[in-house]
């Protein structure tokens, strides 16, 4: 009829063990993409500040 408790536990942990690493990799990939985007924006901001500093020195 129904599954035994042992079968249910094995199914539960089987799903957990299978899906856990996949979701971890997806989250890790998403975090890496966000980090990459953040550093790209950070570098652009630094370049703007450097350019503004150079132009303000030239204007003096």
UniProtKB/Swiss-Prot annotation:
Q: Where are the transmembrane segments?
A: 7-27
What's any one GO cellular component for it?
membrane
Q: Which species is the source of this protein?
A: Schizosaccharomyces pombe (strain 972 / ATCC 24843) (Fission yeast)
**Keywords, sorted A to Z:** Membrane, Transmembrane, Transmembrane helix
Q: Which domain of life is it from?
A: Eukaryota
Cellular localisation: Membrane
Look up and give the membrane topology term: Single-pass membrane protein
Q: What is this protein called?
A: Uncharacterized protein C21B10.15
